[in-house]
Amino acid sequence: MSAIDVIETVRKMRAQETGYKEPHICERFDDFGKDGKPCRLGIMGGTFDPIHNGHLACAEQAREDLGLDVILFIPTGNPVFKRGQRIAPASDRLAMCRAAIADNPYFDVSDIEIARGGDTYTIDTLRTLRGHFPPNVELYFLAGADAIATVSK
């Protein structure tokens, strides 16, 4: 999908207004792991401003290399480490993620950080995910080099 296709899809999605009133942990895989079978969920958070082929390729490679069943993309709501920087509105970044992953059956998107409001901290999101999914779901946190550089902060 080209950047122009993504922009056009975002425009269409904004025009249609998805109507979500509550945060969705997952949009496609909300019942993931509820059957009791062992499974692996990759978690890929980021600003995604914009999401691009590099993000998608890294996620797919991690899925293959780690034997992950699905990857959950989580666009940040109010990223504390990007204060003072200009970033696209969260609703636009969420729509871009939805458009970018739409054709991959192993990818899903979550709006939990955006819906939560306030400052966005990864630990809060991971706690929410751990509480949502049953113990048979192994969580794998995937991070880019830019995120790893801020871990000590």
Predicted regions and their residues:
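N-terminal polyanion-binding entry modules of DNA glycosylases/AP lyases
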Residues: 1-28, 34
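Nucleotidyltransferase catalytic core that binds NTPs
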Residues: 25-153
